[in-house]
Structures are given as C-alpha cells and as structure tokens.
Amino acid sequence: MKKPIIQLLLIFTIVSIVPFLLNTSYISLYTFVGVLWSITIVGISFVIFIENRSPQSTLAWFLVLALLPVVGVLLYSIFGRSRWRRKKHLHRSEEQRKLFREILEGRRLELSLKVPLSERSVHLTEVVQKFGGGPAADRTTTKLLTNGDQTFSEILQAIEQAKHHIHIQYYIYKSDEIGTKVRDALIKKAKDGVIVRFLYDGLGSNTLRRRFLQPMKEAGIEIVEFDPIFSAWLLETVNYRNHRKIVIVDGEIGFTGGLNVGDEYLGRSKKFPVWRDSHLKVEGKALYKLQAIFLEDWLYASSGLNTYSWDPFMNRQYFPGKEISNAEGAVQIVASGPSSDDKSIRNTLLAVMGSAKKSIWIATPYFIPDQETLTLLRLSAISGIDVRILYPGKSDSIISDQASQSYFTPLLKAGASIYSYKDGFMHAKILLVDDKIATIGTANMDVRSFELNYEIISVLYESETVHDIKRDFEDDFKHSTEIKWNAFQKRSIKKRILESFMRLISPLL
C-alpha cells in the first residue's frame, strides 16, 4: 500500500472535477464531495488501523479525523503516515556499509573493556549493545559542559586546534552572533587547509540563508542540508528530523548534547534570559562510534548531490584510535531514528532506569512518556526508589507543557517528586541512576525523540563525569520549586480538561 494518502487525495482531486467537466445535474456537487470525503476518511482510518500503531496514537488520529475531517486528512498526509525508511540509505552500496562495519568490528578488541566496572554496569553495556548501541569504550575521557558559555568556549577552542578535519552537525544553527562566530572559525580553518564538513537539518535550520553560507562555500567548506523542507520529498521527510548535535575534530575530540547553535542558548533572548542546558566533551575510543554516526548521516544527506562512498574515510585520519590511558569508567554511544524499527534510545533508557536500586533522576524539557516508561517510573516510585523529574517551569511550547503536566498525577500519587525549574528554561536531557550511571544527549523524554527523530545519547558508566552530573542536579533542585500533590490536585477543572486533551493528542506532537 505505497503512499496511500497521496493516492487517495489524488483520486479525490480528479473525481471532484468530474461533475464540472461533464456538467452532470443528476447529483449535486455538495453531495458528491461529501461522499468522496467520507470514503477518503474511511480509507485513511483503515490504513491507520492496519499499521498497528500504539493504541494512544491510533486513538489520537481517529479523534483528529472525526473532529477535523478535512484538516485531519491533510495533517495525516504530512505527519501521520507510518515511519518512513531511509530509502536512499537502503540503495547505498551494501558492500561499502559492510566494509565499514568490518573495520569497526575488527577493532572490537581495541574497544574491549579493560577498566574494571561493576557487574551491573558490564551487564548493561551488553544489553545496550544488543539494543543497537555501539560497544562500550573505556580509555575515554568525558567532560560535562554546563550551559552555553562553557560549551561554545570548548568547541571554539577545539576548532582552533584542528589539523585534519572538522565535522559539525546541528538541528538548529542560527546566523546570529554565536552562529557567525563559529562559522568564521570554520572558515579560518578551511583556508588553512583543514577539511570542514557542515551538516544542518532542513527544518530546524530553515532560517539559514545563502548569504550566510556563501562565505563558507567560497572557503572550501562542504555544506549539506539534511532533508530540505522545500523538495519533491516534502511529505516523505518533514516529520522525521535530524535532531542530533555533533562536533568532531580530527577524530580525537567530540561534542554532543542538548545545545544547538544560537544566541538563545547563551541566554540572550528576552523570553529566556537563563537557558539551562548540558553538553558533553568526549576524547578517546568512544569517538569511533560518534564519527561513524556523523558519517552515516553525511553520506545519506549528500547522496543526491555527490558520489560519496565510505572509501575516503577508511583510514586512521578519521579513526585515529586515540586512547586516554588513565581514564575512568566507560562510555557507550547510542543512536536511533525512523530508519530502523529498533527504538534503541528508548530501550536503553528503560534498561538503565530498570537497573535502579536507589534513585532515578530525570531532566527533560518535554515529558511525554510512552506507557512503558510511565509504568516503569510509577512502579519504581512505589517500590521506594527516589524518582525525581526536573522540567521547565516556563516552557517554549504551551502544548507540550500542558501535555507533560497530565502525566504528573500518577507519578505524584506513586511517590515520585516533580521539580519545576524556576530560573529560566530547562533544556538539558539527562538521566542519572544511583549516582553511578548517567545518560546525556539530544533525546527528550517523549515519543517524538523515541520514534520520529534521529537522536543520539551517551551512556556514562562509573566516571567522574557522573558525579559532576549529580552536582548539577543538586544545584538545579535548589533553583526549582517542588510540585506537591496536595496543591497540584487543586487545579481547576478547565486546566485538567486542557491537560487531558493535550495528553490525548500528545502522540501527534
């Protein structure tokens, strides 16, 4: 049933003009169109039903089609169809992909753990790898970067030190002060002979203009847009965005986390004078996986413009194998996206939270969990585990904010603690379990990150960075207001109805 909605809409358009062409009078146009729309909606409902979506998603789409039949059809044609596969990825040379994997597999011994970890951590690394994550890497150092000032300072310093290549990928990249500063640093290195590849998402970075990018092209920087929104494939790609943020310098230094590139991430916007976020600097063996993820995205996005293959990257210049001999703990990089049925990141988060014995602390700007995640958190809280959720007191999305609050009641009743960050916008995406294991990355605790976006997280095992994450959590709790059950249950009926409605349509967000 290829492209069913486009076909149905095409049939509708063609048949709708038949009465005009034939000048028939035995049936009114109003009746004719009404019947045809009914058939179209029934057809779409059938498609939704046989796609075996989650009950919440299925119900949400049925509701939209029932209440907004015309608009609902258009919305579903753009946002609702089942997970789109990267068809161009599948057409790529399987021999090249196999060779690329073999190179990484051949270095598995180099990636094998030599640092002693607890039995639980070792078991988790094995489970996460089965979910699709890369092998856990020791001899890797990580550094927690708190907020924009520290993050951009470290990134610019790393760019300045580049000798061979710089790979940079962002969901949102803005042509403001910090965006221009990073761009100019890239141009300078490109003129010095460093290879620079710049990948940005077509929707998230839709404000980038030719006049901003042209100096980069003139300096020799390779620029690729991930799934442009103005293309023949708009309906195929608009709902599946690349939300990853990656910077790699010489295959030795990497950055990933919650921060995009823009002045607002430095707290320079009137709406959010404080932007609370977290990023991660990585050096060592874990760069193997981070580099591989960037290159896969790069080759996919550039396949329509160039004749790239894996071959130019099969060398030590891109995978130098830098080791940090005195590094503690281990790092595991996990990526997921709509090109695969595996919910690697979601399953990884469930596995990490499921291993908790004492505490589960979560920071997320959007809390719209699926049923499995919500159930795990409820049961953990009931069993006495210290479950805490830190979310923004002031959100950048009213819809997401109301939907998030609809999930608070079952958690508060189970004994979980909810904290509303009051100093600004909480944009960090972090999980901390038992002060021993943590995750940090681009994925929010919501269905979009679990199923629709291309995301990336880093799982940190028993390293000093985990303690730094705990320190930041404790500081954030001091700048937050705890939501008490007695006060929360006194919300007005109007607000509860709004929350419930937003929760009902949350699978569509």
From Swiss-Prot:
The lineage of its organism: Bacteria, Bacillati, Bacillota, Bacilli, Bacillales. It comes from the Bacteria. It catalyses: 2 a 1,2-diacyl-sn-glycero-3-phospho-(1'-sn-glycerol) = a cardiolipin + glycerol. It is found in: Cell membrane. The active site is at H243, K245, D250, H427, K429, D434. InterPro entries: Cardiolipin_synth_Firmi, Cardiolipin_synthase, CLS_N, PLD-like_dom, PLipase_D/transphosphatidylase. GO terms for molecular function: cardiolipin synthase activity. The chain crosses the membrane at residues 4-24, 30-50, 59-79. Its main location: membrane. This is Cardiolipin synthase 1. The gene is cls1. Residues 238-265, 422-449 form the PLD phosphodiesterase domain. Gene3D superfamilies: Endonuclease Chain A. GO terms for biological process: cardiolipin biosynthetic process. Catalyzes the reversible phosphatidyl group transfer from one phosphatidylglycerol molecule to another to form cardiolipin (CL) (diphosphatidylglycerol) and glycerol. SUPFAM superfamilies: Phospholipase D/nuclease. Keywords: Cell membrane, Lipid biosynthesis, Lipid metabolism, Membrane, Phospholipid biosynthesis, Phospholipid metabolism, Repeat, Transferase, Transmembrane, Transmembrane helix. It is a multi-pass membrane protein. The keyword Membrane applies. Its EC number is 2.7.8.-. The keyword Cell membrane applies.
